[in-house]
Amino acid sequence: MIPEERRKNILIKLKENDFLGIEELASELNVSKITIVRDIQILKSSGLIEKIHGGIKLNEKSAGDFESRFFVRMQNNYSKKVEIAKKSLEFLKNKDTIFLDSSSTVFVFAQEIFSSSVEERNLITNSPAILVEALNKPNVNLISTGGELKQEFNIFGGNWVNEFLENLNIDAAFISAAGISSNLDITTNNKDLAGILETIFKKAKEINLLIDSTKFYKEGMLSIAHISDCRRVITDKEISEEVKAILIKETELII
């Protein structure tokens, strides 16, 4: 069982039980105690669970329909997101004002920024999760777009956000997407996010697309831009040779 599936199973079990012991989980999932402890650390840092003596319980604030929640989506292909985030750090160099979108992949990138020794930057975001993560972090000057909070999707949206972004000068944007279509369109399923990203493509001097290899040839409801409009695409090493050959004709590819 891959780590992402195992963590989902842990959350499902917690939905059915008020408390789960670490040794009990290790036995049921047929993995070592060390592996379970590592899973618990990731889920705890995501805000999904609380660690208590001898085990864990579901975080009451995330006890709703967690299958659709942002922090559960973050667990999908989590190792790929971390790989992509670490590669993306080098592209912060000489950039003063950065936009970070509200995707789970970019949230992982934000975590890497906050835990690194990069110089202080102006970070602009429409992500409530990134705002919370940035509390008491010394190397960022964080600017929120404000707007209407859509908790289920971890997004500040609405016309206010677009109007706010129109007045900014952005050196670089780091974004993700629901999928890349067969025509190499960058797509999303969220109307608010589509409008925001369309504005970002107009305003940012440089677009960095952070997207894992499972998203290629997956098509969302709304097209935002073509992949050639990105300065670079940063993905994981499991990208197919076919997709790789196509992308390098359109933009810089970082693997």
Where does each model-flagged region fall?
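Conserved H-X4-D acyltransferase segment
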Residues: 95-110
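Short, well-structured alpha-helical patches and their helix-loop capping segments
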Residues: 2, 76, 80, 101, ...
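Conserved phosphate- and dinucleotide-binding cores of soluble alpha/beta proteins
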Residues: 5-12, 19-25, 30-32, 44-45, ...
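HTH-adjacent hinge/linker in prokaryotic transcriptional regulators
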Residues: 2-5, 9, 15-23, 28, ...
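Short, well-ordered alpha-helical scaffold segments within catalytic/effector domains
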Residues: 81-89, 106-107, 162, 194
